[in-house]
Amino acid sequence: MKTLSAGLLALASAASAHYTFPSLIANGVVTGEWEYVRQTENHYSNAPVTDVSSEAIRCYENPGRPAAKTLSVAAGSTVGFTVSPSIYHPGPLQFYMARVPDGQTADSWDGSGQVWFKIFEQGPQIDPSGLTWPSDGLSQVQVTIPSSLPSGDYLLRVEQIGLHSASSVNGAQFYLSCAQLTVTGGGNGNPGPLVSFPGAYSPTDPGLLINIYWPIPTSYELPGPPVWRG
């Protein structure tokens, strides 16, 4: 019984150190869990993705998940995700978007292909004492939809990468979700560069294979393409 109890405590401790992004925030309103966000495979375990070559790195969708709804938001507005329970591991925060192809819908499109562009990245503050990550401890994260983004249906992908064990290959931990949006009032921008998931990252990218503790890094290279500023 003691062994079983210890095992359950260990599992509970591991789950509490991990996290999900279950709810979309729009117009200051927190929507229901997995209402506009595709339910992720870790919705019970909170466990991360560690293989950047797997299909899970795209949206980490739970097989047989309930269909999510699509929320209408204005270009130039701020949207976000809740974090359950909160961001625990040190690492960067990034947001990507992908436009749903003509003839398809946000609730059924799988997001495959070279279609993703980055709209936000947040790295560390660096000083001689170490790296400080602005996303540490957050229970909500937000991003502005570029005002020149063309109107249409999109997937919005949030990603926070835990680098506490990233000194070995595949040690980086990816926590992510995809929400379904219809962007209105957009412009005539041309988002890019475009990447695919999987494909955007290599397990040996400098921002994914790194000891963030010692020797203290003097720089940090965020993984993925440059941000499209709109």
Curated annotation (Swiss-Prot):
Enzymatic reactions: [(1->4)-beta-D-glucosyl]n+m + reduced acceptor + O2 = 4-dehydro-beta-D-glucosyl-[(1->4)-beta-D-glucosyl]n-1 + [(1->4)-beta-D-glucosyl]m + acceptor + H2O
Positions with a binding annotation for O2: 164, 173
Cofactor: Cu(2+)
Alphabetized UniProt keyword annotations: Carbohydrate metabolism, Cellulose degradation, Copper, Disulfide bond, Metal-binding, Monooxygenase, Oxidoreductase, Polysaccharide degradation, Secreted, Signal
EC numbers for this chain: 1.14.99.56
Regions crossing the membrane: none
Keyword Disulfide bond: yes
Subcellular location as annotated: Secreted
Enzyme class: oxidoreductase
Signal peptide: 1-17
Entry GO MF terms: metal ion binding; monooxygenase activity
Pfam families per record: AA9 (PF03443)
GO biological process: cellulose catabolic process
Name of the protein in its database record: AA9 family lytic polysaccharide monooxygenase H
